[in-house]
């Protein structure tokens, strides 16, 4: 049966989820999880939570799905070790350094690829399986048919979101909160700037980045039928009563193999919605109807929530059925066997019955006494008593027999498996290169690549794979190197075409492929190209670099959320690069932000490269409440990539040159060809030039 996975932001939410039918819960423990402002659990609370869940047949998944620094890795390793000791069933991960650490420290604990890994193709799931992960959580943006294709062919379990908040950006790729306010969504501190007001033509008069919550209750049975192993409910930041309501309804749908009633749909909306729900992504649709905000006048349904709370607080909505077999014989210790439905069986003995001096106890009276399981997590589903005639046994002895049996059964159900433990070993310290970094450039338009730019000295030109046919590679390849940048988001159906484009790119002179997602590894396998990691791999620590080296990468771009000291201190086992100029990418979205507002005849065509007459060809600008303008660029497949309104500028700062970087990237997006040349000359100290509206990004302030 498909597992129902519910959020547990605290102890009350945990009880609400379990009592209302969750098969598993996911929770945070310590500070290393994607919802750091949730209540989460202390050591004692986490151990108690695991016991509470396991006693009732519920699994516990720990969320360690954030990016961590080298300094934080030892504490994370200790957190994971304790979680393993407490019996956690699996751990969700995003950071490749965390993955490497957990494989070494707790090799027997199953790992799940978090949605923060942005897995959205079969190839990505297959790569996760190759690395030993047992489950992959798919991106929320996939359609039902795309989920089916992956679930039916995947070598590991597939988990998908069924209900709750939708991020505007693909999870794990959003930098908006980090860049604007220093609160990183990749480190569990997202400030949700997507819920604020934005607009066009200089006005912030709408909410074009605020998606409605997903509601796939009508498709729960369909997803179970297609082989989805787990349906996930979002909501670790929501109220416990919300968790109770949504869990209860979805549990009933899965258990009873039916569609939701009109009343159940009404209750889901009453529990929480943003002006209704959406199932657009699941149905393979995009558009303005998917967007909404929670009205300021919205109120929690306190009366109904009070009823829900009163029910789950009794903690008797979910009891473990047990079968009793009791035998009472004169002069022999009483024997009671207890068995649950999960294969656990215990036998305990009690005092020996004596011959009755007056009225003898009956089998019915013994059964009635054994069935009194109030205050425990058990209920007696069947009780068979074999008792000789004429026996006397104290009620206290029967109570003790029952308690002993249930205690023994509880011990079996909450038994912690024996697991191996390894030692955390920090990455080997490698001395930074002392030479200043060489400059690479990435372009967005073919016209940005000119003789003037190349003649200034460019180590490598990064070109989007779909743009390469428009670039004169042959003209410049004797003077610079070319790297084909794979799309950040694509689909399984695109992969044959992408491989063919890569082969063509290599034949034309592109020596390198740039990877930004786990699924890219499968696309480039066997092509014999140099491989570099892009910023999408979220390299935040030395262990992640070591992992990428083991996967065959010859270089990697470090996360632009790192401060310059953190960039410097990473142990660079392979050549490293950092973005030191340009508009930083804030979001990549499945919905085309521009087409939603202005319409576009290419919207349904899923174009690879931007078309000259498309709505996004001119990089229209989204405006926020303070007048900041954010250019919106076309991304592969008619998606949108939102850029920062200010341009990262470090030409006048010496620190990046002393950070041990082999390459420093200039990221060109909206610049003219002339501006590209001036920027490169300025970074090389050949021209006095500073663009307007600059920022130092996160180079000095870092992120929470």
Predicted regions, residues:
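Surface-exposed amphipathic alpha-helical tracts and adjacent flexible/coil segments at the periphery
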Residues: 1-20, 24-34, 47-50, 56-84, ...
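Short glycine-enriched, charge-decorated loop/helix-capping segments at active-site entrances
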Residues: 34-40
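Glycine-rich, highly charged phosphate/nucleotide-binding loops
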Residues: 41-46
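Conserved nucleotide-cofactor-binding alpha/beta core module
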Residues: 122-123
């Amino acid at each position: 049966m498909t597992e129902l996975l519910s959020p547990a932001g605290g102890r009350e939410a945990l009880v609400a989820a379990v009592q209302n039918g969750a098969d598993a819960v996911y929770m945070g423990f310590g500070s290393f999880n994607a919802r750091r402002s949730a209540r989460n659990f202390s050591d004692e609370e986490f151990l108690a939570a695991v016991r509470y869940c396991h006693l009732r047949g519920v699994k516990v998944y720990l969320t360690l799905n954030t990016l961590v620094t080298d300094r934080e890795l030892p504490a994370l390793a200790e957190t994971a070790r304790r979680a393993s000791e407490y019996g956690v069933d699996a751990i969700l991960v995003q950071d490749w350094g965390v993955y490497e650490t957990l494989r070494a420290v707790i090799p027997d604990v199953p790992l799940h690829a978090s949605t923060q890994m942005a897995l959205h193709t079969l190839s990505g799931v297959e790569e996760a399986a190759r690395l030993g992960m047992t489950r992959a959580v798919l991106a929320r943006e996939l359609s039902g048919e795309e989920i089916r294709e992956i679930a039916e062919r995947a070598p590991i379990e597939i988990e998908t979101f069924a209900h709750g908040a939708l991020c505007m950006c693909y999870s794990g790729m959003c930098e908006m909160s980090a860049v604007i306010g220093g609160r990183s969504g990749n480190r569990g501190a997202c400030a949700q700037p997507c819920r604020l007001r934005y607009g066009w033509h200089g006005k912030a008069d709408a909410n074009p980045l605020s998606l409605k919550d997903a509601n796939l209750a009508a498709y729960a049975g369909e997803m179970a039928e297609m082989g989805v192993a787990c349906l996930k409910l979002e909501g670790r930041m929501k109220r416990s009563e919300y968790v109770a309501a949504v869990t209860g309804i979805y549990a009933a749908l899965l258990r009873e193999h039916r569609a939701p009633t009109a009343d159940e749909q009404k209750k889901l909306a009453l529990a929480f919605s943003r002006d209704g729900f959406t199932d657009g992504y699941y149905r393979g649709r995009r558009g303005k109807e998917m967007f909404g905000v929670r009205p300021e006048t919205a109120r929690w349904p306190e009366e109904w929530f009070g009823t829900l709370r009163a029910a789950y607080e009794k903690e008797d909505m979910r009891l473990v059925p047990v079968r009793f077999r009791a035998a009472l014989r004169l002069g022999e210790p009483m024997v009671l066997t207890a068995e649950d439905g999960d294969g656990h069986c215990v036998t305990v003995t009690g005092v020996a019955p004596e011959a009755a001096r007056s009225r003898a106890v009956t089998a019915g009276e013994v059964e009635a006494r054994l069935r009194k399981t109030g205050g425990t997590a058990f209920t007696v589903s069947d009780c068979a008593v074999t008792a000789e005639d004429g026996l006397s046994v104290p009620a206290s002895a029967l109570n003790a027999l029952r308690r002993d049996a249930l205690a023994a059964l509880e011990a079996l159900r909450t038994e912690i498996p024996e697991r191996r433990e390894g030692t955390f070993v920090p990455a080997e310290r490698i001395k930074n290169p002392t030479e200043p970094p060489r400059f690479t450039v990435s372009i967005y338009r073919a016209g940005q690549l000119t003789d003037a730019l190349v003649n200034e000295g460019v180590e490598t030109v990064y070109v989007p794979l779909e743009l390469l046919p428009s670039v004169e590679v042959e003209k410049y390849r004797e003077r610079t190197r070319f790297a084909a940048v794979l799309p950040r988001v694509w689909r399984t159906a695109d992969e044959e075409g992408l491989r063919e484009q890569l082969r063509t790119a290599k034949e034309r002179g592109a020596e390198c492929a740039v990877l930004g997602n786990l699924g890219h590894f499968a696309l480039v396998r066997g092509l014999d190209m140099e491989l570099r990691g892009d910023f999408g791999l979220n390299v935040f620590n030395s262990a992640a670099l070591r992992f990428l080296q083991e996967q065959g990468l010859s270089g990697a771009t470090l996360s632009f959320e790192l401060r310059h000291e953190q960039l410097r201190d990473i142990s660079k086992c392979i050549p490293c690069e950092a973005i030191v100029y340009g508009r930083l990418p804030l979001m990549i979205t499945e919905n085309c932000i521009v087409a939603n507002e202005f319409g576009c005849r290419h919207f349904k065509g899923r174009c690879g490269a931007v078309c000259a007459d498309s709505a996004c060809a001119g990089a229209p600008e989204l405006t926020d409440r303070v007048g900041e303008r954010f250019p919106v660029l076309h991304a592969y497949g008619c998606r949108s990539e939102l850029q920062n309104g200010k341009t990262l500028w470090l030409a006048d700062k010496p620190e990046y040159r002393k950070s041990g970087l082999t390459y420093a990237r200039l990221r060109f997006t909206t610049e003219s060809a002339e501006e590209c040349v001036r920027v490169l000359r300025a970074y090389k100290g050949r021209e006095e030039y500073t663009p307007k509206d600059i920022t130092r990004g996160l180079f000095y302030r870092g992120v929470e």
